[in-house]
Amino acid sequence: MVLKKFLKEIQSILPGISAKLTWTSEEGSYSQDMTGVTPFQMIFEVDEKPRTLMTDCLVIKHFLRKIIMVHPKVRFHFSVKVNGILSTEIFGVENEPTLNLGNGIALLVDSQHYVSRPNFGTIESHCSRIHPVLGHPVMLFIPEDVAGMDLLGELILTPAAALCPSPKVSSNQLNRISSVSIFLYGPLGLPLILSTWEQPMTTFFKDTSSLVDWKKYHLCMIPNLDLNLDRDLVLPDVSYQVESSEEDQSQTMDPQGQTLLLFLFVDFHSAFPVQQMEIWGVYTLLTTHLNAILVESHSVVQGSIQFTVDKVLEQHHQAAKAQQKLQASLSVAVNSIMSILTGSTRSSFRKMCLQTLQAADTQEFRTKLHKVFREITQHQFLHHCSCEVKQLTLEKKDSAQGTEDAPDNSSLELLADTSGQAENKRLKRGSPRIEEMRALRSARAPSPSEAAPRRPEATAAPLTPRGREHREAHGRALAPGRASLGSRLEDVLWLQEVSNLSEWLSPSPGP
């Protein structure tokens, strides 16, 4: 009976379908198999032109994909036979990570379902999963003029938001939000499709400020009506594009940007047992009058969504500020070192610096130095998401625990060691001369001048092993004479700093 009701209402569920569906058969067993799955089959006949049929099939595929996103255990075998030619496509996932949102929904969190990125394999800068933030549920109000049944319960909206792809480390490019995708779901996780694909925007969503105060984040939203059905992604019901600001264009921004995913789940809650047909009636009410219901409940809806988006974008905003500060600091450090290198009058000092980073000239030295600083700071300030930290922990311990637990310190150390090994191997090739210099210096006996009391300003080096090396180098520089004291002292100190930089790039042994 439920399946026949589904057939009767499928035209309203999929408004993009122009075909008139005719029930021909219902086959399959309704008893569960060994895996606990209840299979069934529905076959329909349609009579329409091939081009129209192709569009209708795309609409159905999109509907099935949206169901899979919140019901990953369901599998659909979608077959189309046209003029004797049969084509079959299977919709379903196996062993993919999900996140229970607490409202009975298990949401797929693999980013590949939501965005298509040519360079998505760059795991250095982005996590392969989204990390949704669940908002607080609010009750929706039904306008008095909306004709329909009397509901013995409440309509509850629960938002969830996430950035896709999710940044996990500091990269050389600032992350910017380039688009917003909104996905609508009704009771039992059934997709809500509000209108035809020719006019996919309702009055409520045409006003870009109805959901979130985007000006708070200096974002200007424009409704995006160009939704391509012929893509292997779950398509949003509502989409906005973000206009690039002059500030974004003046900085090194990720050209593709991030997408803010916003999931709106509308469910029905009642103090009495809810019948299947009652749920279907609520679903029909939502597909017909959701726009009016959202307008009537505008204040509570905007408050809940704003709170959820604030939590997501505040993290994004703080990360962007930290990245800008880090980039500015790196530029200052590189410029300071370059001023010492180019200002030195000793060719041996400049040659040693270039050899340390295997650079042919000062321009290449600047480029490599900036790259080295950037890579090292990425490893030092690594912000790994809990899923990938746990994944590496599982490989290390060979256990079978959940993937959403919080990381421990040992996991973070494991990641830092793993990420620094490749850079360590590359940089060790430039260090033999440095080690040779240290051996020569340590083999020398201290001269009387080295043992003599130093001026107060000469003891400004920190009281650490590095500081002692600075003082020893300074003492040795005093012996040959006072004429060239300034330049030679500067050369020795900065040569030692370059040496220290080479050592810093190599991972230190564990405690």
UniProtKB/Swiss-Prot annotation:
The annotated regions of Low complexity compositional bias extend over 440-451
Q: Where in the cell is it found?
A: Chromosome
Question: In this record, what's one Pfam family?
Answer: DUF4554
Query: Where is composition skewed (Polar residues) in this entry?
Result: 408-422
Q: Which UniProt key words apply to this protein?
A: Chromosome, Disease variant, Meiosis
Q: In which tissues is it expressed?
A: Detected in lung, spleen,colon and in skeletal muscle. Expressed in the ovaries, Fallopian tubes and uterus.
Membrane found in the keyword field: no
The ranges of region (Disordered) come to: 398-485
The positions making up the signal sequence are: none
Which Gene Ontology BP terms does the record give? meiotic DNA double-strand break formation; reciprocal meiotic recombination
Q: Does the keyword Nucleotide-binding apply?
A: no
Tell me the InterPro entries matching this sequence: TopoVIB-like
Biased composition (Basic and acidic residues) is annotated at: 466-475
Q: Which domain of life is it from?
A: Eukaryota
- Can you list the GO cellular component terms from the UniProt entry? chromosome
Predominant subcellular localization, coarse grouping: nucleus
Q: Which family does it belong to?
A: Belongs to the TOP6B-like family.
What miscellaneous comment appears in this entry? Expansion of a polymorphic CGG repeat within the 5'-UTR of this gene may be the cause of folate-sensitive fragile site FRA11A. The expansion is identified in the 15-year-old proband with intellectual disability as well as in phenotypically normal members of the family.
Which disease is reported for it?
A: Hydatidiform mole, recurrent, 4: A disorder characterized by excessive trophoblast development that produces a growing mass of tissue inside the uterus at the beginning of a pregnancy. It leads to abnormal pregnancies with no embryo, and cystic degeneration of the chorionic villi.
Q: What is the protein name stated in its UniProt record? A: Type 2 DNA topoisomerase 6 subunit B-like
What broad taxonomic lineage does this protein's source fall under?
Answer: Eukaryota, Metazoa, Chordata, Craniata, Vertebrata
Q: Which gene encodes it?
A: TOP6BL
